[in-house]
Curated annotation (Swiss-Prot):
It comes from the Eukaryota. This is Aberrant microtubules protein 1. One of its GO terms (biological process) is microtubule cytoskeleton organization. Disruption phenotype: Microtubules are shorter than normal. Required for normal microtubule organization. It comes from Saccharomyces cerevisiae (strain ATCC 204508 / S288c) (Baker's yeast).
Length: 123
């Protein structure tokens, strides 16, 4: 059995490993980023109350106003809550990317930086 993952490199340094199934939603996310009137947007991952542990909520948020640009619910093959917990940012608040806070860390993973490159791996 092979495992497919995508690696997103943000601003050329911060890397995120995401399951292939989750990557399939990035077409919509890229479009939301490019069509956003403000370049100051970030991605927020969370689980939704009342949905299964295998449902991931992916939102694009404008960082200045915290206005929701777009959101999608994704059914994953991997437990979304466990995936968020294992991939959440573990840094001092002062070192966290712009427009993130402790509430974001507790609820999911937020990124304010733009995706620099995307690579696909299968192993």
């Amino acid at each position: 059995m092979s495992w497919r993952y995508s690696i997103l490199t943000v601003d050329g340094s911060f890397k995120i490993f995401i399951p292939w199934e989750i990557f399939l939603t990035w077409n919509f996310l890229s479009a939301a980023w490019l069509n956003s009137t403000e370049s100051n947007t970030y991605i927020h991952y969370s689980t939704c109350w009342g949905t299964s542990d295998y449902t991931l909520n992916i939102s694009v948020i404008e960082a200045t106003t915290e206005k929701l640009v777009d959101t999608r619910l994704l059914t994953t093959l991997e437990n979304a809550t466990a995936w968020i917990n294992s991939n959440s940012i573990d840094e001092d608040e002062d070192d966290m990317p712009h427009a993130t806070n402790v509430a974001d860390r507790l609820d999911g993973l937020s990124l304010s930086k733009r995706v620099y490159s995307i690579c696909h791996y299968e192993f």
